[in-house]
Swiss-Prot record:
GO molecular function, one term: ATP binding
Species of origin: Rattus norvegicus (Rat)
Residues annotated as domain Protein kinase: 34-299
Catalysed reaction equations from the record: L-seryl-[protein] + ATP = O-phospho-L-seryl-[protein] + ADP + H(+); L-threonyl-[protein] + ATP = O-phospho-L-threonyl-[protein] + ADP + H(+)
Regulation: Binding to NEK9 stimulates its activity by releasing the autoinhibitory function of Tyr-97.
Gene: Nek7
Self-association state and partner proteins as the record states: Monomer. Interacts with NEK9; interaction takes place during mitosis; it relieves NEK7 autoinhibition and prevents interaction with NLRP3. Interacts with ANKS3; this interaction alters the subcellular distribution of NEK7 by preventing its nuclear translocation. Interacts (via N-terminus) with NLRP3 (via LRR repeat domain); the interaction is required for the formation of the complex NLRP3:PYCARD, oligomerization of PYCARD and activation of CASP1.
List of catalytic residues: 161 (proton acceptor)
Protein name, entry field: Serine/threonine-protein kinase Nek7
InterPro entries attached to this UniProt entry: Kinase-like_dom_sf, Prot_kinase_dom, Protein_kinase_ATP_BS, Ser-Thr/Tyr_kinase_cat_dom, Ser/Thr_kinase_AS
Length: 302
């Protein structure tokens, strides 16, 4: 998080300190059992805090969703159902969902903490230094991401929001895919469709045409992410671009080719088949993961 300039004090961080005795019987299912330490992120309708459980000392991320009380009963039920699905995921490259509960009319989600950094920060670092990420480094992280998505898809769970900011990297170089599957519950259609707040560079053509999201939409986003790791910018990025021109570029798959002198034919080909306007022609995650495993083994030993 950026530091506050001296002399400029931000709003005080809300405190959710226990007002009453601990509830050991409730485990991770009440705010009374957590000490909130600091805010580490915020979305349009949610805030994420670093916290620690007062029962076992485990550091966690606590996501508080304010829009929950604006949802109708069906949306709430669907959301809780989705979180229950996410709790069943168990993979070293997927952020673990520990618990969720409603308290003070807010939805609280307790997650594994991954605060060492994320892929967007790494991309910015290389861009600032005017250096490309070495291909073997690209595969080192990408193969872990594919492993995470393979686990999710095998359990019929879509991610729905794959982008560099949702790919966390621990201090030991382990990838953790986070912010799983819940974006559609905590967004406003009007905001997503008509504003450039959080420009949707990774939006697939079928989403532009409102044909619904499917597993192949995750593959499109995965291809965009692989491209961005190599080019240090989104395939459809452009200066002074409005939403209409962005959508046109996406529909036409109009993006600059990756430099062939820096990146292998295999990497460039994988990007091309993932960023295909026709979802049916995109590979499934098993295929992408196989290529990533082969290329990781090949580049790691060279």
């Amino acid at each position: 998080m950026d530091e506050q300039p001296q002399g400029m004090q931000g709003p005080p961080v809300p405190q959710f300190q226990p007002q009453k005795a601990l509830r050991p019987d409730m485990g991770y299912n009440t705010l009374a059992n957590f000490r909130i330490e600091k805010k580490i992120g915020r979305g349009q309708f949610s805030e994420v805090y670093r916290a620690s459980c007062l029962l076992d000392g485990v550091p966690v991320a606590l996501k508080k969703v304010q829009i929950f009380d604006l949802m109708d009963a069906k949306a709430r039920a669907d959301c809780i159902k989705e979180i229950d699905l996410l709790k069943q995921l168990n993979h070293p490259n997927v952020i673990k969902y520990y618990a969720s509960f409603i308290e003070d009319n807010e939805l609280n989600i307790v997650l594994e903490l991954a605060d060492a950094g994320d892929l967007s920060r790494m991309i910015k670092h290389f861009k600032k230094q005017k250096r490309l990420i070495p291909e073997r480094t690209v595969w080192k992280y990408f193969v872990q991401l594919c492993s995470a998505l393979d686990h999710m898809h095998s359990r019929r769970v879509m991610h729905r929001d794959i982008k560099p900011a949702n790919v966390f990297i621990t201090a030991t170089g382990v990838v953790k895919l986070g912010d799983l599957g819940l974006g559609r519950f905590f967004s406003s259609k009007t905001t997503a469709a008509h504003s450039l707040v959080g420009t949707p560079y990774y939006m697939s053509p079928e989403r532009i045409h409102e044909n619904g999201y499917n597993f192949k939409s995750d593959i499109w986003s995965l291809g965009c992410l692989l491209y961005e790791m190599a080019a240090l910018q989104s395939p459809f990025y452009g200066d002074k671009m409005n939403l209409y021109s962005l959508c046109k570029k996406i529909e036409q798959c109009d993006y600059p080719p990756l430099p062939s002198d820096h990146y292998s034919e295999e990497l460039r080909q994988l990007v091309n088949i993932c960023i295909n306007p026709d979802p049916e022609k995109r590979p499934d995650i098993a295929y992408v993961y196989d290529v990533a495993k082969r290329m990781h083994a090949c580049t790691a030993s060279s």
